[in-house]
Design a protein with these regions (language model features):
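Short "repeat-start/strand-capping" segments in structured domains, especially the N-termini
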Residues: 9-12, 28-33, 46-50, 63-67
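Amphipathic alpha-helical packing elements
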Residues: 51-52, 59
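Long terminal segments
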Residues: 1-22, 57, 63-133
């Protein structure tokens, strides 16, 4: 069943793709934690909407199944559930998932920045640099 505030089905692993269609990371079936395919924890989903680093920095937000960058309002990643936004390339095959590594402790969230206006284009950070903000 799809949660009203979260566009993804419960208990499903959701792959996120970059602007070239390459699978970069996934949302674990717990619906909260994002992992790279090598098992590295990347960030978590806060209030079913915001992507937050474990250091407490707001990185982006979910919008119609895609992730929007807090830096400039551009589209960073998409899923099979994405709608709207810039044109999406064909999705490439997903790599196998390695065992998940332990997650770091979540630090207190920083103040949430104001959202920039959405831009209907791909972010230059549609890659792992998004998580190194």
């Amino acid at each position: 069943m799809i949660n009203v505030s979260n566009p993804f089905p419960d208990n499903e692993i959701i792959s996120f793709y970059d602007c070239t269609g390459m699978p970069i990371f996934y949302l674990h079936s717990d619906g909260e934690n994002f992992y790279h395919y090598d098992g590295t924890p990347l960030a978590y989903l806060y209030n079913n909407e915001f992507i937050v680093s474990y250091s407490g920095q707001y990185l982006g937000w979910l919008y119609n199944g895609s992730i929007i960058d807090y830096k400039n309002g551009t589209y960073v990643f998409f899923t099979v559930y994405s709608s709207g936004g810039p044109s999406r390339p064909s999705r490439k095959a997903r790599p196998s998932r390695a065992s998940r590594k332990s997650r770091p402790s979540k630090l207190s969230c920083n103040s949430r920045p104001s959202r920039p206006s959405r831009q209907i284009r791909w972010s230059e950070r549609s890659n792992m640099s998004f998580f190194r903000s």
